Amino acid sequence: MELNELTIIQIREKLKNKEIDAPTLVDSIIKNIEEDNKRDDKIYAYLEIFKEEALEQAKKAQERINNGEDLPLLGVPLAIKDNLCYKDHLMTASSKMLEGYKAPYTAPTVQRLIDNGAIIIGRTNMDEFAMGGTTETSNYGVTRNPKNRAHVPGGSSGGSAAAVAANFAFGALGSDTGGSIRQPASFCGIVGVKPTYGRVPRLGCIAMASSLDQVGPLTKDVKDAALMTKIIAGFDPKESTTLNIPVPDYVAALDGNIKGMKIGLAKEYYDTDLIAADVKENVMDAIGKLKDQGAEIVDISLPNAKYGSRVYTAVMDVEVASNMGRYDGIRYGYHPKGDFNLDEYYYTSRSVGLAFETRARILFGTLMTGKRFFYSHYQHALKVRKLMQMDFDNAFKNVDVIVSPTSPVTAGLLGTRDQTDSALSFLADSYVSNINLVGLPAMSVPCGVDKNNMPIGIQFITKQFNEVDMFRMAYAHELANK
């Protein structure tokens, strides 16, 4: 196995034991990225590599290692999504609107990685302002799936997922508003975690939909995911949505023992012909192995799950319209040149600075808050959101973990996102976006491949702030399928 194929914990052990030095490690990864970028079908996981800075940080990390310092991420190269603040570094959310913008401070999640010794190697590509599921709406080019370059990596954290899957980073940060960590993790065959809403600070992450957004890690295995989640989690006094409650040691909880734990299977996620046969078969086989390890299978129902995609669209677009209001070319954003009145200036800034997908969501969200639709659609969506929360609360009275496919299908071909069947799209959204609507923790873990050798993901969901059981079940699955 090549060094860049190792996990965070494995490479830390080699750094600690002086089997490899940090500058050599960072230089090797950067050279691999640069070599790949010469290809016509380059993966294009990164918008920017912090080459000189990363190499300098690696030298300092090695000095600290030589002096006996021991931190969980010391000398480990990690990546961050292009919507996370890293002081004095470019941050564009893959949009022309923020072209040339530099972050004025470092996000707490990024700072916590740095405080634990990580080397931030670069910023990764994404769908513009995190609006998309394929990483094809980026203003700076598409990212390809490392497992098959003709396919999408998923989105919106497709660059982060591709970087980890291609061994261009040992781990990465992404953001998840409606599956934007878990779905690309599934498509690229890696692990992706969306922690409980309020477990990890959102400060320093460009807001898409403030009641849904959550920052989380993408890694090569469950143990690394547990480690990174532990590091970035916790109260931040500047972040109003984080709760001041203890963060468990998730790595220590990975004992592989799930005997007596109850797994819930929601009929709404399985009783449909829209799930690809390979996906359903692999997920059910994995559940069977968990049962063999002593877990109990319980049939449950989430009756309002079928409305999830529509509820998500209404809530998300309204919040998008609100959050995107600041990008007017005056406070933030693209500054058009010419003689304009105020309305013309706003129009030109947004028309040039924002891509179609983003403009469409702003328009739909604005429409939803108008008199005609506010009560009949938006307010109704909020009520159904509450019913969905009650469904999950009731389910968790009887089970410890809910298990589902992360996506009913595997990664599609590049350039085909507008050809997806609407019913399938609604179902795919419901697997992941429902979890954001109710603020639960969930993670995607690899679960075999389909007939075309494309990765399949299995999703583990637990009640709020019970990431321990989520990681424990995911780890048991991982051990059973090695």
UniProtKB/Swiss-Prot annotation:
It catalyses: L-glutamyl-tRNA(Gln) + L-glutamine + ATP + H2O = L-glutaminyl-tRNA(Gln) + L-glutamate + ADP + phosphate + H(+). One of its GO terms (cellular component) is glutamyl-tRNA(Gln) amidotransferase complex. Its EC number is 6.3.5.7. One of its GO terms (molecular function) is glutaminyl-tRNA synthase (glutamine-hydrolyzing) activity. Disulfide bonds: none annotated. GO terms for biological process: translation. Allows the formation of correctly charged Gln-tRNA(Gln) through the transamidation of misacylated Glu-tRNA(Gln) in organisms which lack glutaminyl-tRNA synthetase. The reaction takes place in the presence of glutamine and ATP through an activated gamma-phospho-Glu-tRNA(Gln). Heterotrimer of A, B and C subunits. This is Glutamyl-tRNA(Gln) amidotransferase subunit A. The gene is gatA.
